[in-house]
Each structure stands twice: as C-alpha cells, then as structure tokens.
C-alpha cells in the first residue's frame, strides 16, 4: 500500500495530484481540519499555503523542538515549513498555468516531482543560513 501511494504520487500528472497521493492519511486530516475550514472564509490560494505551512510545522518541524529544548539547544529553523510553503506556491502556480504532464513518461514525471521537491528544500535551506 505505501509503495503504491509513492508510485502513484511520483507518476501523478500534476504537482497538486502528487500531494493527493503522497500521504492519504495526512491528506485527509489536513483537508478536514485545516484546508476546508480556511477555504470557507478565505481564497483557495491562502487555504493551500496555510495547509502546507501547517503540515510542515506541526507534522514535521515542531516534532524535533522538544528534544532540542531538552538538550538546552535552540529550536531549529523551520526548514520543512518553509519548503512546504514553496511547494504550495508551486502547486498554485502550476494549477493556474494548467500544467499537465499526462503526455510525459512516468519516469520524466517522477524526475520533475523530485526536482520541485529539491528546489523547494534547497531554497528553504539557503534561507535558514541567513541571520534572522
């Protein structure tokens, strides 16, 4: 089942579809408790960015903070949160531009999805090096 989700995600025809397949359980929870409530009051783009940011922070970055604080260290820069915001912006942009990769081979689609993730995380890591 997990392998199937990963395979479907990386061969998805759009970046938005990638995230629908990536983690169905997180996707359901985030849609129900984050995206939909925000979407009722604000534009879709704000709901998408907010949902990706919440996922990055609460389901990824925040999990490391208690251990760092217990060790007397500062919490880490929220690299995943910022990377997910970049990914959200890519999802919004590719949807607005109607980017569709149906005609591409599955391996090419997988490479494009990996490139998007790599660029988002590279941008976030670079941002983490600035003295905030």
What are these regions (language model features)?
Residues 87-101:
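Transmembrane alpha-helical segments of integral membrane proteins
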Residues 52, 79-87:
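Hydrophobic core segments of alpha-helical transmembrane domains in multi-pass membrane proteins
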């Amino acid at each position: 089942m997990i392998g199937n989700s990963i395979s479907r995600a990386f061969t998805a025809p759009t970046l938005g579809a990638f995230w629908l397949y990536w983690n169905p359980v997180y996707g359901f929870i985030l849609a129900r408790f984050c995206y939909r409530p925000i979407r009722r009051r604000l534009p879709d783009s704000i709901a998408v960015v907010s949902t990706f940011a919440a996922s990055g922070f609460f389901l990824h970055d925040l999990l490391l903070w208690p251990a760092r604080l217990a060790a007397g260290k500062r919490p880490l820069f929220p690299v995943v949160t910022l990377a997910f915001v970049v990914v959200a912006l890519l999802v919004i942009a590719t949807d607005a531009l109607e980017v569709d990769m149906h005609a591409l081979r599955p391996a090419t689609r997988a490479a494009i999805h990996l490139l998007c993730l790599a660029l988002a995380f590279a941008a976030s890591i670079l941002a983490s090096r600035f003295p905030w």
